[in-house]
Amino acid sequence: MDQIRIAADSSCDLLTMDGVDFVSVPLTVRTAVEEFRDDAALDVDAMVTTLRGTKGRTFSACPNIADWESAFGESGDVLAFTITSSLSGSCSAALAAKKRCEEQNPSRRIFVVDTLSAGPEIALLIEKSAAELRSGKSFEEVCTAVQQYQRRTHLLFALESMHNLAQNGRISKLAATMAGVLGIRAVGQASEEGTLEMLGKCRGARKTQELLLSEMVRLGCRGGSIRIGHCRNAAFALELCTEIRRRFPGAEVKSYPLRGLCSYYAEHGGIMLGFAS
């Protein structure tokens, strides 16, 4: 069986994967004077510190068509995963690269998944595809399994800071400032359309945890694989892991620091939570 490659932009927070041919395609975070490429060399903590003190506009930039073509390689079938198309042009670039590659080699098959999400939910989709590949499934079978699984996966998030969202124009600076002054944490989800949908506002870690857990139940979580990414908030992530294991015995829960792109959006203290129903 020919090797099947998995390619994903860096919103998945993965750099390598055991037992599969995996390529990460970096996004970039930019200020007026500095650029942070979301690859293995990025010092995420230094980036977060710099951005917290940045007063001017900041923004993220997606991989271009050539970046995706390079990630797809010159031969073989590819499964590609991108951050939601509602936040980035990464999916459009990947689709354009797919078209070029398949025109150059009509025997190739490149399947691009607009995940309508980011971070831990994408990680779950990639883990699912890798598991299917390791079990010997065909390219078509893996694509079908991923599509079916995507219908059941979800992303929740809790933000302590919305500075970067304000700096790149996604929310008003007044709203971000008020949230910071009042100690409000915004809890939301990736909607079915792949947009950021706010679910509620909380004060304090305990109320934030309770809202996240109640939303997991509402969305049909019964355990299984659960992934928690955090930006400088390992203590809260650990507490959340512990409570999830208590409420969902047998759940396979992992927490980890977010990489560059997700740390840009989640910011200092932010949490991203991926699971399936």
What spans do the regions from the language model cover?
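N-terminal glycine-rich phosphate/adenylate-binding segment common to multiple enzyme folds
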Residues: 65-101
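A glycine-rich beta-strand to alpha-helix segment
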Residues: 82, 111-112
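Structured helix-beta-strand junction loops
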Residues: 54, 74-75, 81, 152, ...
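Short glycine-aspartate micro-motif
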Residues: 5-7, 78-80, 258
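Mixed-charge interfacial surface used for oligomerization/domain docking
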Residues: 2-3, 11-29, 33-34, 87-90, ...
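N-terminal glycine-rich anion-binding loop in soluble enzyme alpha/beta folds
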Residues: 4-62, 67
